[in-house]
Regions:
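Short, low-complexity N-terminal intrinsically disordered segments enriched in polar/charged residues
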Residues: 1-36, 40, 127-128
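Hydrophobic pocket/interface hotspot
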Residues: 21, 33-34, 42, 54, ...
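Short beta-strand edge/turn micro-motifs at domain boundaries
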Residues: 88, 100-128
């Protein structure tokens, strides 16, 4: 049986938690970011200069990073839900200046809510 794609109520939930994540990211609300990542050794976040495996590595990165220059504008955001408990979120972003990037997240609904289980952030070469 195939999962139903983008059930309206599930899509609304993931859109809301994605917006909460984005607000926490640009405002450096580390406690919210920590809450929204699955607290597991299996959680993965590949960034522009770091490969983080496990929630402890992700927490250490978030705590140590500079809170300066986190603002960004999102473009071409696509959120897709698969059934009631799985979703992906992909977006492009632009920061002040010319830097541009992309972000992908995999979300799973657990008993305590939606959590990111895998994330990837990369920059786009502006000379293209």
């Amino acid at each position: 049986m195939s999962p139903v794609i983008n059930l309206p109520e599930v899509l609304a939930e993931v859109q809301a938690v994605f917006a909460r994540y984005e607000d926490a990211l640009v405002n450096n609300r580390v406690e919210v970011l920590d809450e929204l990542f699955w607290p597991s050794e299996f959680t993965v976040r590949y960034g522009t200069g770091e490969n983080l495996v496990g929630i402890e590595a992700i927490r250490a990165f978030r705590t140590a990073r500079s809170p300066v220059g986190l603002g960004r504008t999102l473009m071409n955001t696509v959120i897709t839900t698969y059934g009631r408990d799985f979703a992906t979120a992909s977006t492009e972003f632009h920061r002040d200046g010319n830097s541009a990037g992309r972000q992908s997240q995999t979300w799973v609904r657990f008993d305590d809510g939606w959590r990111v289980v895998a994330a990837h952030v990369s920059m786009i070469n502006s000379s293209r």
